[in-house]
Amino acid sequence: MMQKFRKLSLESQLFFSFMAVSVCLLLLSLSITLSSTITRQRQEIDKNISALAAYVASMDSVVSMLENGYPDGSANEALDSLSENFPDLNVIAIYNTTGLRFYHTNRKETGETFVGGEEEAILKGSQPYITIGYGTNGSQRRAFHSIPNSDGAIIGFVIASVFN
């Protein structure tokens, strides 16, 4: 191939060299732009699901639902409305400290328990965090937030997630 290239006129060699360098620079700039755009979008998603999880954890109806020990219709209505108004959010789930699910965006999954161990840190009092986990609907980006009662004791946790 190099022999064919060398047989070309100087003008053709310069043209092909310039085009090759231009294509390489174009691909490099596109990959950098794509990478930064994906990173920015991921940060925006993380910010949104974390803020939503914090909001849900602060809802009085959610706290009273966990304190009473059974799902509450008013809390379900408020959470359903919240879920409908955030179409990019795929799952909101609320659990008590033993992992029993009190609310899930998909009603069929209410009453099940959380498995996976990702919740252990939040139940021990860590700051809210985001993980990438694998659930019944595939890979998810999940924001964990603890739910404290009026005394500050952790009585459960909320997960807000989007599918990857």
Language-model features: where?
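Core beta-strand residues in small-molecule sensory/regulatory alpha/beta domains
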Residues: Y95, P148-N149
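Extracytoplasmic/periplasmic helical hairpin
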Residues: M59-T113
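Extracytoplasmic/periplasmic sensor domains and loops in membrane signaling proteins
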Residues: H104-G138
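Membrane-proximal extracytoplasmic alpha-helices
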Residues: M19, T33-V63, Y70, S74, ...
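Helix-start (N-cap) segments at beta->loop->alpha junctions
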Residues: D72, N137-Q140, D151, I159-N164
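Glycine-rich acetyl-CoA-binding "A-motif" of GNAT/NAT acetyltransferases
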Residues: I154
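Extreme N-terminal signal-anchor transmembrane helix of membrane signaling/transducer proteins, especially
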Residues: K4-S35
